[in-house]
Amino acid sequence: MLLAGVVHREYDPPTALAAAVLCILLGNPYAVRSLSFQLSVGSVAGILAFSQRIFRYFREKYFPKQKFARKCLAYLYGSVSVTMGASVFSVPLCALYFGEVSLIGFLTNLLGLWAVSFAFYGILLSVLLGAIWLPLGKIAAFLTSLLLRYFIALVRLLSAFPLAAVYTRSLPIALWLGFSGMLLAVFLWHRRRPVVYAGACALALAIAVAFSWLTPLGENYRVTVLDVGQGQCVVLQSAGRTYLVDCGGSTGQKSADAAMEYLYSIGIFRIDGMILTHPDADHVNGAALLTGRMPIGETYGIADTDVLITQRTEIIFADCKITIFPGLTSGTDNEKSLSVLFQPGKRAILITGDQTVAGENALVAAGLPNLDYLVVGHHGSDTSTGETLLSATRPLCAVISVGANNRYGHPDQTVLDRLAAYGCTVLRTDQNGTIIIRG
């Protein structure tokens, strides 16, 4: 914009955006792969392409004669049109990269955009006044901080609502997002009857959410082995109750995000209990983050938990039973790892954490039923899933929670051959993604 005035040329927003993008990419061509670059360019492109048209549409529909009302509505229309324009390209990018779509973004921008605008000028003023006289700059900075605190409090308040965002890991939500995109394209082409399009979009969202939330209620049980990279996080559901076995992965953020997004996507906003098999990071590094995000009942583990497991412990509800077996009393953390047997009705699913062959032998001696599913111990390491366990339990299917191209070489080929010899169907999170077992 400034350069156009200097060289006496007409300012053209799309050309200016293209020039800015060109300058950035000339300096660093790899910036095109940066999410922040894509979101910034996409948001500005959406504002330039659509916001003015949306603003004109609102203004033509209703614009009062009273001066004060006109100013208020001009601000409202401006905030709405900028938010809608920026969302055209930013929402698909967020869905693609983060797997979620914010439903409070529109309201947050409407209530908080003014504070951000004033805070920007307040920061500049604070710097200038501070350069002249520091105490005066501090006063301006304090007043500016009130705006920022308001905005942060607003975001925290709105994001606490259960439907603050929807997650594309749910197929109905992903289909709704595609349907909404098609509706938007049709509306931008015809520019007629926006209420009909908005209503259709809202109705489709309600149907998608209802389908996502109600589907698990029609199942006797569900076991979900989340794809958390090199780690483990398993969700056990039955009879309206939800338990989590471990919450760890390649990073704590990834495992906590995966657990929360999955549970929210199916309408679960509270975990009845969390069982931490042992304190290795790839099994627990997301537990603290998840605890801070959603209410969790009792935690079970071998250290620093509500319930310390030193002997066989049973959790019984409806026709389900969760049995927690203690590990060996001495040795490494892996050898002390808890094992969890989930028995919804006549089914049996065993999770052995990082238990070793010696610990598995102790489990077999304690008494195990034939298994429908085995969540393979230690991500498929050759220190676990021994002959004794497999011959005693005869699992029909083995699930391996493992990260792609991990540096440990998991799962070990010896273990895969052993499972094949016992006729187990093998599913892996590095190949199949999140694995859901329903019954």
For the regions a protein language model found, what residue spans apply to each?
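Stable alpha-helical elements in mature extracytoplasmic
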Residues: 121, 255, 259, 267, ...
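Cap/insert and terminal regions of metallo-dependent hydrolase folds
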Residues: 362-434
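Core dinuclear metal-dependent hydrolase active-site scaffold
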Residues: 6, 16, 23-33, 37, ...
